[in-house]
Amino acid sequence: MGRRKIEIKAIKDDRNRSVTFLKRKGGLFKKAHELSVLCSVDVAVFIFGTNKKLYEYSSGDMRELITRYTYHGGATEHKGPSDFNGGDDDDEEEGDGTPPLDQPMDAHMMPPHFQGQGPFPPHVMRHYTPSASPPIPNGVPFPPHGHGVPRGHTPQPQMLSRPGSRNDARRMGQPMGPQGSPQVNGFGFGQQQSMYGPPNTTMPPHMPPQMAPGPPFPYPQHPQHPPHPPHPPHPPHPQQPHQPQMQQQFIEDGRRATMPANFAPHPPPPHGPMGMQRHSVSPPQQHPHHVPQLPPQQPQQHPHSSPPQPQHHQMQSPPQPMVKFESPQQIEPPQHQHQQQPEPQEPRPEQQQQQQQSQQSQQPQEPQSEPARSLPPPPPPLEVKTELAPPAQPGRIPQPSLLDTAVKKLPRQKQHSIFTPIDENRSILSQHLAAFHAEPSKNKSSPPAHHRSSSVDESTSNASEASRGKDKDIASSPPLLKRADPRASISSVSSAPESAPAPPSRSNSLRAGPPRPRLKVQIPDEQSEDGSGSATAESASSAQGGASTDATSQSTRQNDSHSSTNMVLPPPSPSASALLSAGATGPPNPFAPKRPPQHPAPGLNIDTPVSALPSRFLNNEFLPSPSSFYPDWNFRGGDNNTLPSPLNFATPVVGTGPSFLRDENPGASLKRKSPDNLSIHGPISDNPLEAGNEPKRVKVDS
């Protein structure tokens, strides 16, 4: 008569398991609700499904319940799977539970991840629960505040099966609880993260968890770091002096750590505190707290300082092409270094030298790299930035080859930074802009061209390419402007005394070819004459520079005139009626000046097919001159205050028959025109239609 009992074992079929899960989960939540209402108790149910989804029911505020559970004393009653071996209750999704609190667990009843350890000492369990944060199944119970009693049987591996009773709530408790320490890795605490990361087997066998400092600051967010309690060889008392300090550091770690315990998979070093130090790599504020611990932990400082080194390189590498950004970044790493290592500073100068040598190879700029290497403390890199401008002048001459390499290497470095704009060495727009914006600097640098004029004449294209890269450097940062000057002197070809021809020679390879045909087609005559006159004058003045300078000066002057006329050309184009055809242009420009209707011959425009005309002109395709009709279009309806529309053509043609006849369409459209507009059309329509239209026009106007 009663319900059929099923055997309580894992369901293999996925479909049956999902259906059973949904039904029993709903029933469990319903029972929990009934229990909470009937007995006025607080109930919280957590279910971690096999799909890693979390299902929960809580009769009140879940965070409050979790906090109360976390800080509560030992459970009065605790049930696990062993209590329901033959029963109907189901915990099938997670299966395993923690042992009852008061009696030891038999070996045959232990879950698989408890097999390797003996029964729990009750006093350890009692000490464990008051400050409980990590679940017991992970095998890392912790000594509470004053007790240094590490358990001797904790090294079992973490398994995916989680206990379904109180430890699930505890595992869930940390992410949801209102404790002050924010989550770092997004999971509740380390034991749950170890499901996805490497297991906690890397911990030393007798290492209690990092939670020990007590309830006010649960630290589960810093999972896999073997915490402060000492390694088994050390007696518990070394832990005591470090505990308050470690607690403070853990608090700071939870608030400031920006990396989700990426260094945790490393096997922990002998001291527990160092595992924490490994995690606190990024925030430099924590390092002052490490200072008191340096004497016992000098061997640890070096592994701890090793993670920040790639970090400092990453900090410096993106802005290296920009000298401005480089010097402030150089200031920061020494500060980190001094904060991190008050005592072992031996590796730091070497690291700085390596960093600066890499910077020197990437931007071979000797005036900057040598002071930066010789002065490791923070202020001198600022001096490097300020000193760059004067020393670059004497150092220009020996550096053209270095600048070539710098121009080639800069784009690679700039790609590493998100803050730098598009690579200037590869931006064609910046090349053309720099060609004109950098001309004053070129003119300044043309006198030094005496030194290089002999070697430069043979390769003007190379000089132009080099100057192209140089102009990007000038645009990027002021200190690089001095560095760019050698390029300018290279690009100013043998005509050194004349500063005017130097810019044309510079932009020869960039702009020489294409603009000339454009000049012939687009530039009006008077402007082209001016441009050609200036070009010939410049070429005559630069005759000593050779044929190449003549050509480049002409091309550059043409480019200048072309750039000035580009802004002049577009306005006349809409109103140039000589270029307009009736079918091709569409509606006219209403703001264009009216053209006298006498230039276009009527025969020229009638040839356009009717299909090419706009639809509103289809009734009037045989007007003698549509091109003269367009400018008058918007002024046609001035008398009756109506905008033009196709209906204006159709309505007058009431009794005149089909509208496609040649005799009637012009008349039909002209019937509604005012005498003023007819006078405008007068020169075109000198045919007999006008005389015939006179009486009709009088009728319409009256």
UniProtKB/Swiss-Prot annotation:
Protein localization: Nucleus
Q: Which UniProt keywords apply?
A: DNA-binding, Nucleus, Transcription, Transcription regulation, Virulence
Region: Disordered, residue numbers:
73-608, 658-702
A GO biological process held by the record: positive regulation of transcription by RNA polymerase II
Q: Which GO terms describe its cellular component?
A: nucleus
- Per UniProt, the ranges with Acidic residues bias are 86-96
What function does the entry list? Answer: Transcription factor acting downstream of the MPS1 MAP kinase (MAPK) cascade during conidiation and plant infection. Required for overcoming plant defense responses and the differentiation of secondary infectious hyphae in live plant cells.
User: Could you identify this protein by its name?
Assistant: MADS-box MEF2 type transcription factor MIG1
